[in-house]
Each structure stands twice: as C-alpha cells, then as structure tokens.
Amino acid sequence: MGKFVEKLEKAIKGYTFDDVLLIPQATEVEPKDVDVSTRITPNVKLNIPILSAAMDTVTEWEMAVAMAREGGLGVIHRNMGIEEQVEQVKRVKRAERLIVEDVITIAPDETVDFALFLMEKHGIDGLPVVEDEKVVGIITKKDIAAREGKLVKELMTKEVITVPESIEVEEALKIMIENRIDRLPVVDERGKLVGLITMSDLVARKKYKNAVRDENGELLVAAAVSPFDIKRAIELDKAGVDVIVVDTAHAHNLKAIKSMKEMRQKVDADFIVGNIANPKAVDDLTFADAVKVGIGPGSICTTRIVAGVGVPQITAVAMVADRAQEYGLYVIADGGIRYSGDIVKAIAAGADAVMLGNLLAGTKEAPGKEVIINGRKYKQYRGMGSLGAMMKGGAERYYQGGYMKTRKFVPEGVEGVVPYRGTVSEVLYQLVGGLKAGMGYVGARNIRELKEKGEFVIITHAGIKESHPHDIIITNEAPNYPLEKF
C-alpha cells in the first residue's frame, strides 16, 4: 500500500460543535449556584469565560469597557496605529478609576472651542481649569453649548469643591450628591491638582459588581499585536495593558516564534499567543501564558476553503488542551461559537474560555457600521483576513504584509453584516445563562468540574436536525435562538 493511501487511513476524525452533545448526569447542582469564573493567565481571572475578538468590527475601547464590566475581557484589535491603540487602552483604564490621575486639563485663557476639542478627543464631558497647577474652575459641555469663540474663564464654574487624596468612595459620593456636582478635583497638601473623581465612575463601580479590575481598581483590558511588532507591544505595556495577545493566523510559524520570544522578554503584561490547531505547536509556545485555538472555524473565515488547512474546532481544542495541560498553559477556544451550548462544549473539551466575534459584532458597543436592510437593523462584520481588513493593515496577520500589492492579496475571509443584537450586557446574559444551564445538566459546580465531568456523545446529521426546533413554524423569536440564518 502506498504512503499516500496510508496518510488517509491514518487520518484522525475531526469533530466540531454540531457533531457532539454532552450527556446529562445525576446532579444536585442548580444553574443559579454555579461559578463561571475562570483563569486565562496566571494573573488574570475573569468572572465569565468570554473574550471579545481582536477584530476591527468587534473590539475597540467601548467593547472592551463593556466586556470588563460584565466580567469578561475585550481584546482591542491592531488594525490601527500604535498611538491610537495605546489611547484606546488608556480609555478603558480611565473608564472606572476612583481617582483619574492623568487628568486632561485646560488653562483659563484658552477658547471654549479648544475645550470642546479636548473633550471630544478624550471622550469626556468636562475639564478642570488649571492655572499654576492650582484648580481655578471647572468647565463642562453644558457650559459651552452654543457659545463658540468665548474664553474658558468666562464660562467656567469658579467655585470648585476639592478633596484630598485620602478620600474614600462613600465620602466622595456623599459630597457629590449633596452639592449636585459631577466632578471632584483631588489635590495634594499644597493644593496642586493630582487627580479627578467623577460621578459616572462612582456609579459604574457600584452598578457593575461583576466587573474585572486590576489592583488599582481599573478595568482589565487586552490588546492584540503582530508577532513582529515588538515596538507596539512595548508601548501597550507602558500604557498599562493587562494582556498582550499575539494575533496571527498561524502562530506555529518559526520566524514568528523567534520574534515572539524576544517580545515576551520585553513586556511585563501577561502573554497569550494564537492561533494554533495542532498540539505540536504547544511544544514551541511554552513561553506563553496561554494559547488560542482555532484555524478557520469563524463564520467570516475562509482559510479552510482557500488554503485547505484547519482542524474542526472541538477536536482542535481537545488536542491542544491535552498538550497544554502538560505545560500548565491556559487554552482559549477562538471561533465557531454560534450558541451558548457551544461554549459549554468548548469548555468540556478543555478550553478555559472562549473568544467571540460573530455573536458580539451585532451589539451596540461593536465598532461596525449600522446598516438597514429591508427595514431591519444590521451591523457590518468582516474577517481580519477579508480584503477590506487586509487593505486597512491586517495583511500581516496572514503573512501577506509589506511585499504584497493590494490587488494581489489572497483573502482568507469575507465581509458582510449580522443582525443587530442589542447591548453586550443583553447578549452576555443569554450566553452565560445557557452556560450555567449546561453546567447544571452535567453536575458541574465550576469550570474545572465541567472539564472533568463533561462526557460527549457523537451525533449523526439526523441527530443535529433533531436537536434544533423542528416540525413547527416559530412565531416568536427567542433571544438566544435567532431565526435569521445566513
């Protein structure tokens, strides 16, 4: 028998989410009692096992803030300049600080037009007015309304209440409520401005009790980099990013690995590398804290069709997880998740968390443009291997940067739209609810037990059809089971 026939006979069988179900077990566990927190690196623990994808129609700072507030993690995409990505990370970090230290200020002799420019640029509604390092006023968008051309000192509020650095949350909140103010400048013993407390930050800290924060009380955030862009990684690290995610279509590229090892030595942030689908890759990526699994499972990815390469996602996750366990690495399943049940399956197959693109691309916080088609709202969504994303700068992810002409790109993704799905909070509520339900059926009190107790059954095509609603015309669409198929 020839070696090529032997290749086929030795080929393993690959399974994806629709090919398997989890077998229900005897249990005393109820969904409301399960713990869905997970660790994705030695220093980063999430309260829900979900990350948003590093895609230019999925994650920018608004998505990252929303994800962290719900207990997950946003990975800001790299299809932008270094300075812009650094600023996006800083925006997330500023979103809920008790005391904002790097305060944007303005001088009293500046124009209100410049004040408005600063507010728009930094996504804020007001500015302390500072002269000789002392606070002399506060100016807000409300003060400026329709008063272009005037000076800040003409419109600012001059009677400013300040507080010391030792202020506690409850005391700051009480002062702001009693005085009906939205901002409290923080000063040192010499009266020098050292920070700012805002009402929106205090309210957010109380509202989002499941949020994930660092030791300074700031929201967690991750950012993507090319395996060769060491300068970007260093700048993001300086900006306080919690996790660097090396974002490439094929992380088992030996040139990329050499560069990633050098990068790892130059940053303090935790380090995730992806994507891979072969357990052998783990042996060469042990310098990472976690690996990201998925070659071509995404709804907008054409790698498997264009390149003929990939491993069905459940099998890929299981193979990589077995090897990663030997080195103490964490595993993130990236791509192919369509329903909450797929999250349950991915974790039972060995993942510590999942990364979502499609399911979050239709949310309010996603940066994709809204479009109306036949009276229904959609949001644009594209793969980072699509022609549009490559032209914007994402070609390097597929090792097509630099030497390729635009007209000669070989795309590995498509561009399209997905239905508008509401807010990130609403979508995650349904997804986490489904995860908890699955854990209840399996008898898993936490993510670790789901990995240990989850037992799979392989199903046929008829079994897949039986699993979905059938023999009925659905008249009321469920929030976790969309009727619109693409």
From Swiss-Prot:
Residue positions of the active site: C301 (thioimidate intermediate), R397 (proton acceptor)
CBS domain span: 99-154, 156-215
UniProtKB keywords: CBS domain, GMP biosynthesis, Metal-binding, NAD, Oxidoreductase, Potassium, Purine biosynthesis, Repeat
Binding site for NAD(+): D247, G294, I295, G296
Activity regulation comment: Mycophenolic acid (MPA) is a non-competitive inhibitor that prevents formation of the closed enzyme conformation by binding to the same site as the amobile flap. In contrast, mizoribine monophosphate (MZP) is a competitive inhibitor that induces the closed conformation. MPA is a potent inhibitor of mammalian IMPDHs but a poor inhibitor of the bacterial enzymes. MZP is a more potent inhibitor of bacterial IMPDH.
Keyword Repeat included in the entry's annotation: yes
Signal sequence segment: none
Catalytic activity from the UniProt record: IMP + NAD(+) + H2O = XMP + NADH + H(+)
Residues that coordinate or bind IMP: S299, D334, G335, G336, G357, N358, Y381, R382, G383, M384, G385, E412
Positions bound to K(+): G296, G298, C301, E466, S467, H468
UniProt cross-references to Pfam families, sorted A to Z: CBS, IMPDH
GO biological process annotation, one example: GMP biosynthetic process
EC number: 1.1.1.205
A GO term for molecular function: metal ion binding
Organism superkingdom: Archaea
UniProt keyword Oxidoreductase, yes or no: yes
Cofactor: K(+)
Residue runs in coiled coils: none
Functional pathway: Purine metabolism; XMP biosynthesis via de novo pathway; XMP from IMP: step 1/1
Quaternary organization: Homotetramer.
Function statement: Catalyzes the conversion of inosine 5'-phosphate (IMP) to xanthosine 5'-phosphate (XMP), the first committed and rate-limiting step in the de novo synthesis of guanine nucleotides, and therefore plays an important role in the regulation of cell growth.
Family membership: Belongs to the IMPDH/GMPR family.
Name of the protein: Inosine-5'-monophosphate dehydrogenase
